Amino acid sequence: MGKYFGTDGVRGVANSELTPELAFKLGRFGGYVLAHNGTEKPTVVVGRDTRISGVMLESALVAGLLSTGAEVMRLGVITTPGVAYLTREMNAQAGVMISASHNPVQDNGIKFFGADGFKLSDAQEAEIEALLDAEEDTLPRPVGVELGHTSDYFEGGHRYLSYLKSTIEGDLEGLKIALDGAHGSTYSLAPYLFGDLEADTVTIGCNPDGNNINDGVGSTHPEKLAELVLDTDSDFGLAFDGDGDRLIAVDEQGQIVDGDQIMFILAQDMDARGELKDHMVVSTVMSNLGFYKGLESLNIKSDKTKVGDRYVVEEMRRSSYNLGGEQSGHIVMMDHNTTGDGLLTGIHLASIVKRSGKTLSELAGQMTKYPQRLVNIKVSDKHAVEQNEHVAAVIKEVEDEMNGEGRVLVRPSGTEPLVRVMVEAKTDEDAERFVNKISDVVRAHMGL
């Protein structure tokens, strides 16, 4: 990570940290680095989520892009994977998404995609950061007819949905599915997609007002969706996050089905159909021990990366694997898209439920989860946790007590000023006790 770029683009409190001035510079410098590779009039597609700050930042970003001579196509409210897909499909030189994903409404972010639909490399981010920190802006300033134009392509969302439909066999007729759009990017796309596939749908989180994105709804708050599933006797529920790149499900009993379980279900189905490349799934170090044991029972291999879907994607690209993801619900199906895609994952999961004739609880129950506890602690310097001797000592103490029957992971968040403490153990009681023991030490020596 650099000075400006975190694990998922540039993020901050909108109009305070992520200002219109910075958005203009990101448009100008980012657009130049990505789009002006011998292309006289490069095309850049731009999408956003439903945050109140989105239009402000979009306007500034687009102005920066236009100042370099780029042609800009505004997609309006759309998902992050929708931007990635349309960047490739429309032969654009770059794509930009304005969103802070699952973060609260006051935050926003800007993430770039190259012409191939993949997020930026470290080298590209470093090049943009060097331009941001330069004493003088020496990039070309076209005038007159050489300036860029802007146009609206709000139909792009439905072009993306048409593609998603083509990735599954048949329809979803006979299923009743509860959908939670997080008052975000999927608020209209999800009901349209699943309805078009003949599913019976009920919804929450599909009435954005600019300020309610992720507010008690979506993939980080699936409790209301669980209630909706039970109240409406739905077959299962699907919860998306603010920008639609992750998915958490709820089974017919109201139990949460997380990214590990979804990956397990997809891997089992893909492997049985001969579609899982090298019988391999890529996950992060946060995936549950039960996930790995479940894959082993199916003779499916696994590979671990650092936390962050960008690292999952990097490993998948490096080794040509086609399924990977995170416990948080970022699931990457590389045969179909270049980034985590909640809608894509959702229709494939629904298709498996229909084809198998099993309930989602039966499918998810084939993987036994180890009790896991995760605590997020606000700190002034999140990276200092890696060198803190008090934290290191308590981790060793807990690991010695576990004696191999569990694991501990303490790490800085990639996007927020937090230290994340994760513990897995044989019992709920042990997991709770161990995570509290470590968290108390982190708070005492590092907390605000």
Curated annotation (Swiss-Prot):
PTM field: Activated by phosphorylation.
GO cellular component: cytosol
Entry note: cofactor: Binds 1 Mg(2+) ion per subunit.
GO molecular function, one term: magnesium ion binding
Database matches in Pfam families: PGM_PMM_I, PGM_PMM_II, PGM_PMM_III, PGM_PMM_IV
Top-level taxonomic group: Bacteria
Coiled-coil stretches noted in the UniProt entry, renumbered to this chain: none
Enzyme's top EC category: isomerase
Record-listed Mg(2+) binding positions: 101, 241, 243, 245
Residues annotated as the enzyme's active site: 101
InterPro entries the record matches: A-D-PHexomutase_a/b/a-I (IPR005844), A-D-PHexomutase_a/b/a-I/II/III (IPR016055), A-D-PHexomutase_a/b/a-II (IPR005845), A-D-PHexomutase_a/b/a-III (IPR005846), A-D-PHexomutase_C (IPR005843), A-D-PHexomutase_C_sf (IPR036900), A-D-PHexomutase_CS (IPR016066), Alpha-D-phosphohexomutase_SF (IPR005841)
Cofactor: Mg(2+)
BP GO terms, sorted: carbohydrate metabolic process; peptidoglycan biosynthetic process; UDP-N-acetylglucosamine biosynthetic process
Keywords from the UniProt entry: Isomerase, Magnesium, Metal-binding, Phosphoprotein
Modification Phosphoserine, positions: 101
Catalyzed reactions: alpha-D-glucosamine 1-phosphate = D-glucosamine 6-phosphate
Keyword Cell cycle: no
PROSITE patterns registered for this protein in UniProt: PGM_PMM
EC number: 5.4.2.10
Entry's family note: Belongs to the phosphohexose mutase family.
The protein's role, per its UniProt record: Catalyzes the conversion of glucosamine-6-phosphate to glucosamine-1-phosphate.
Protein name, per record: Phosphoglucosamine mutase
Originating gene: glmM
